[in-house]
């Protein structure tokens, strides 16, 4: 969640060889850049370097919450997230949205919903950049990529990346991190390619057909693993909670991402967040004497939460 406190007009970016510099072109010309990086480049060109300050850090609750404030010239925005990085990311994103809304900053983005691949040389096709252009064109938040899994032997590595756009999600796999990101972006573009601009279908409506694992589907699932969870006490010793959660995820069609928190807890324990790509997204906190124990505790808490949800009628 992001908040803007002051929406003063930002000075237009200037090139040395021409007039107004297009922030939109700067974003789309450099696909894969995070909002933090884009805002920093904007600040460099306008001589207003973004300044980030941590306003709140609450790690004692079930789900840690961080609030960061970013100031760029006369613009101040805040962002919240379950990690410092995510909070800064959202604060920068909010500032970019204000700059985008400024009439003095032009945005040269394609009018069609999808770029025309036939007009682009094959060696210049970039699904990551095309998806970013699509998000900017429709005023959506920029796509977020998360490396969720890395495995395979050294000579044949396989990476799995989760791409999120608003509440939409796709998973891509590849022999490199970049290839996995491209694959996830390509899946998004393929999904949107059948939507004509005339239909004016909002992203929210599109998401409704691809929600994946919802609370409703979880409660009514005939799956063996989820029904076993309903009958489990989740207190038996030597239970592999990470494996059990993974089996339920495979059965119910959602992904799990473990995010290690850099800061230790108040009593000196490691901390971790388990993020489940359910709809809505589930985030559970865990702690322990090691990173592995923290992940196991987060998985245990996630299982307890899923058990409560699945048993409700």
Swiss-Prot record:
Entry GO MF terms: double-stranded RNA binding; enzyme binding; pre-miRNA binding; protein homodimerization activity; protein kinase activator activity
Domain named DRBM: residues: 34-101, 126-194, 240-308
Keywords tagged on the record: Cytoplasm, Phosphoprotein, Repeat, RNA-binding, RNA-mediated gene silencing
Tissue occurrence: Expressed in brain, heart, kidney, liver, lung, muscle, spleen and testis.
Record PTM: Phosphorylated at Ser-246 in unstressed cells and at Ser-287 in stressed cells. Phosphorylation at Ser-246 appears to be a prerequisite for subsequent phosphorylation at Ser-287. Phosphorylation at Ser-246 and Ser-287 are necessary for activation of EIF2AK2/PKR under conditions of stress.
UniProt region (Disordered), positions on chain: 1-20
PANTHER family (UniProt xref): INTERFERON-INDUCIBLE DOUBLE-STRANDED RNA-DEPENDENT PROTEIN KINASE ACTIVATOR A, LOQUACIOUS, ISOFORM B
Family, similarity comment: Belongs to the PRKRA family.
Subunit structure: Homodimer. Interacts with DICER1, AGO2 and TARBP2. Also able to interact with dsRNA. Interacts with EIF2AK2/PKR through its DRBM domains. Interacts with DUS2L (via DRBM domain). Interacts with UBC9. Forms a complex with UBC9 and p53/TP53.
Function: Required for siRNA production by DICER1 and for subsequent siRNA-mediated post-transcriptional gene silencing. Does not seem to be required for processing of pre-miRNA to miRNA by DICER1. Activates EIF2AK2/PKR in the absence of double-stranded RNA (dsRNA), leading to phosphorylation of EIF2S1/EFI2-alpha and inhibition of translation and induction of apoptosis. Promotes UBC9-p53/TP53 association and sumoylation and phosphorylation of p53/TP53 at 'Lys-386' at 'Ser-392' respectively and enhances its activity in a EIF2AK2/PKR-dependent manner.
Comment, domains: Self-association may occur via interactions between DRBM domains as follows: DRBM 1/DRBM 1, DRBM 1/DRBM 2, DRBM 2/DRBM 2 or DRBM 3/DRBM3.
Protein name stated in the entry: Interferon-inducible double-stranded RNA-dependent protein kinase activator A
């Amino acid at each position: 969640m992001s908040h803007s406190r002051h929406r003063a007009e930002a000075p237009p970016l200037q090139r040395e060889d021409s007039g107004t510099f297009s922030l939109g072109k700067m974003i789309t010309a450099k696909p894969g850049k995070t909002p933090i990086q884009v805002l920093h480049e904007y600040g460099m060109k306008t001589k207003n370097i973004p300044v980030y300050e941590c306003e709140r850090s609450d790690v004692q609750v079930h789900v840690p919450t961080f609030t960061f404030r970013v100031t760029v010239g006369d613009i101040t925005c805040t962002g919240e997230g379950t990690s410092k990085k995510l909070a800064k990311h959202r604060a920068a994103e909010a500032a970019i949205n204000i700059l985008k809304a400024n009439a003095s900053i032009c945005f040269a983005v394609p009018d069609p919903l999808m770029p025309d691949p036939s007009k682009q040389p094959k060696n210049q096709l970039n699904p990551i950049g095309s998806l970013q252009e699509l998000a900017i064109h429709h005023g959506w938040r920029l796509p977020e990529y998360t490396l969720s899994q890395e495995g395979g032997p050294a000579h044949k590595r396989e990476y799995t990346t989760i791409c999120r756009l608003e509440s939409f999600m796709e998973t891509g796999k590849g022999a490199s991190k970049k290839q996995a990101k491209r694959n996830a972006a390509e899946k998004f573009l393929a999904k949107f390619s059948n939507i004509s601009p005339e239909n004016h279908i909002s992203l929210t409506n599109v998401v409704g057909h691809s929600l994946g694992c919802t609370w409703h589907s979880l409660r009514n699932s005939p799956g063996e693993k989820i029904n076993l969870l309903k009958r489990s006490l989740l207190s038996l010793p030597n239970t592999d909670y990470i494996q059990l959660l993974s089996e339920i995820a495979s059965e119910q069609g959602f992904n799990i991402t473990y995010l290690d928190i850099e800061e230790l807890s108040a009593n000196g324990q490691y901390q971790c967040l388990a993020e489940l790509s359910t709809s809505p997204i589930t985030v559970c906190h865990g702690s322990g004497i090691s990173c592995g124990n923290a992940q196991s505790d987060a998985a245990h808490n996630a299982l307890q939460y899923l058990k409560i949800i699945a048993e409700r009628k």
